[in-house]
């Protein structure tokens, strides 16, 4: 019997103000863990899989049940320790300490590879936490929409003089992360053709309004794109097909998209990427009998796809890696120039990171969408001179369907995160919001990740692989009083290629929460400015000076 599979489970987080735990500081992680497994949020909730191949919220259902049980009895001076999705200890700490500390998927570097991890996973000794799956702050595909939108806007500025009308993006993958591409692309004015091998994922994105149309042949999909571009109205199309097949076929036909990228689960060749010519059922069966054969076939198909991306780049397409490590996989299969197209962070996002700008997200624990709409208005009130941000919030309200508990994300920087969080806490205190909110972020942020093929690719000083920074980030957030803190390995790009940390804090309207919020949401983005200033980025150095950061070696 597989302790991780239970199709009878249907997890819905409680709404409203009635507590199941002893305080909001423990109610919040309980609700957010449950929300990660909401059927409208998780990719395979019956298997505890939230997104990203096998990114889980808990190691197995026994561990899930025990975590819930412990959170419901946890005191406000106790801390629960979670080791790769398993609750392993409760210790007396103090009221300002985190209520939960999480470590997921961490391996000693020599053994930090998929082969060793998969053996541990089979033995029930490990769990892949991805980024926000195992740290209980996944909010559905919205969580990456704005970052993807910002990237596509930057692509338009750099390559098309800011004009995206009549242009289209080719990509692959409509899972929890990849599903953001279609909506983000049309928000930025592009049409989008996204290849996906799992029809249920296309249907899910149609239902949640992330995809406009479904196609079952390349000709049909291209016709939809062409009609939309001629009409001047962008459209997103989910094409039921293997990305490697489609990318190579477009090269053969001489059809060149304006932009090419990919968000298949290439980071996990065993569980995340379907080899060319295979059905999903065949792949599932082969994983049980010939793991090495599956990995080899998947990576061979990735090599085909990356070679096609290189060919499309040569033909004039703006081509970028969107952080799934597909270039590395192709390189290992003999595509020697796989890294000739850039990753999205050094190409488009790093200047934002230098100012501590990143994915600030919050969730209404009440379950009431009105709480999110009120906080949207507060963001506009406190940041009045940012029309780009206001436009994002307006589009998000109009076009993004909430998944599970209502949530919002917006990219803001060092000077604004603590200010907004303190305002939200005050709104809870004075009754403007019907219940507390939690504030967190993706692990993809300015100071919380070391990932040489993604967030820290091509650092100015060559420090791409130095992972002291996310460790320091996690330690500082713990010392600052975050409600829960996590430290993971392998998110986004797979085993051996990243280390990263997460943070979540509760705004419950108390004065004590205000003090914690003020510390955490200043210090957390400040570590990103520190990290980039240390690497030599002038934007970060200037930001540090303007904000009065005490960086001894920058004097």
UniProtKB/Swiss-Prot annotation:
Cellular compartments per GO CC: cytoplasm
Described function: Catalyzes the conversion of urocanate to 4-imidazolone-5-propionate.
Name of the encoding gene: hutU
Catalytic reactions of this protein: 4-imidazolone-5-propanoate = trans-urocanate + H2O
Pathway of action: Amino-acid degradation; L-histidine degradation into L-glutamate; N-formimidoyl-L-glutamate from L-histidine: step 2/3
Pfam families from the UniProt entry: Urocanase, Urocanase_C, Urocanase_N
Cofactor(s), by name: NAD(+)
Protein known as: Urocanate hydratase
GO molecular function: urocanate hydratase activity
Source lineage: Bacteria, Pseudomonadati, Pseudomonadota, Gammaproteobacteria, Alteromonadales
Family that this chain belongs to: Belongs to the urocanase family.
Protein species of origin: Shewanella sp. (strain W3-18-1)
This enzyme's EC code(s): 4.2.1.49
Annotated keywords: Cytoplasm, Histidine metabolism, Lyase, NAD
Subcellular location: Cytoplasm
């Amino acid at each position: 019997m597989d302790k991780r599979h239970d199709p009878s489970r249907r997890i819905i987080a409680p709404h409203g103000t009635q507590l199941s735990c002893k305080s909001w500081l423990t109610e919040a992680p309980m609700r957010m863990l449950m929300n990660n497994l909401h059927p409208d949020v998780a990719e395979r909730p019956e298997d505890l899989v939230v997104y990203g191949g096998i990114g889980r919220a808990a190691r197995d259902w026994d561990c899930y049940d025990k975590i819930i049980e412990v959170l419901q009895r946890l005191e406000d001076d106790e801390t629960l320790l979670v080791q790769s999705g398993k609750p392993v200890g409760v210790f007396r700490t103090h009221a300002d300490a985190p209520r939960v500390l999480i470590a997921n998927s961490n391996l000693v570097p020599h053994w930090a590879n998929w082969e060793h991890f998969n053996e541990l996973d089979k033995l029930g000794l490990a769990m892949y936490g991805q980024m926000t799956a195992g740290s209980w702050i996944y909010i559905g595909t919205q969580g990456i929409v704005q970052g993807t939108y910002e990237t596509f806007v930057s692509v338009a500025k750099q390559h098309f003089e800011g004009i995206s009308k009549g242009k289209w993006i080719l990509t692959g993958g409509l899972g929890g992360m990849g599903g953001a591409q279609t909506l983000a692309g049309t928000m930025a004015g592009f049409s989008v053709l996204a290849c996906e091998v799992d029809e249920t994922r296309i249907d899910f994105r149609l239902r949640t309004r992330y995809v406009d149309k479904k196609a079952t042949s390349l000709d049909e999909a291209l016709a939809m794109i062409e009609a939309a571009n001629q009409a001047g109205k962008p459209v997103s199309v989910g094409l039921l097909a293997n990305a490697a097949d489609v990318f190579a076929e477009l090269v053969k036909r001489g059809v060149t998209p304006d932009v090419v990228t990919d968000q298949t689960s290439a980071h996990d060749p065993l569980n995340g990427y379907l080899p060319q010519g295979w059905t999903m059922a065949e792949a599932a069966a082969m994983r049980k009998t010939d793991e090495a054969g599956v990995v080899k076939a998947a990576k061979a198909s990735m090599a085909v796809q990356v070679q096609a991306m290189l060919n499309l780049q040569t033909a004039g397409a703006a081509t970028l890696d969107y952080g799934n490590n597909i270039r590395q996989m192709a390189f290992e299969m003999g595509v020697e120039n796989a890294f000739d197209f850039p990753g999205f962070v050094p190409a488009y996002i790093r200047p934002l990171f230098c100012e501590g700008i990143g994915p600030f997200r919050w969730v209404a624990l009440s379950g009431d969408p009105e709480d999110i709409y009120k906080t949207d208005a507060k963001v506009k009130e406190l940041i009045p001179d940012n029309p780009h941000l206001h436009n994002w919030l307006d589009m998000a309200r109009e076009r993004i369907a909430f998944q599970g508990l209502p949530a919002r994300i917006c990219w803001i920087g060092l000077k604004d995160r603590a200010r907004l969080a303190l305002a939200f806490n005050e709104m809870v205190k004075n009754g403007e919001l019907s219940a507390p909110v939690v504030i967190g972020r993706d692990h993809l942020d300015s100071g919380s990740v070391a990932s040489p093929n993604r967030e820290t690719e091509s650092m100015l000083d060559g420090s791409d692989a130095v992972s002291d920074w996310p460790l320091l980030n996690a330690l500082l957030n713990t010392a600052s009083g975050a409600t829960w803190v996590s430290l993971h390995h392998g998110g986004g790009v797979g085993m051996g290629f990243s280390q990263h940390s997460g943070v979540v804090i509760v705004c419950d309207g108390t004065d004590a929460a205000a003090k914690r919020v003020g510390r955490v949401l200043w210090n957390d983005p400040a570590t990103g400015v520190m990290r980039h200033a240390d690497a030599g980025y002038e934007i970060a150095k200037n930001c540090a000076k303007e904000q009065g950061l005490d960086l001894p070696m920058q004097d």
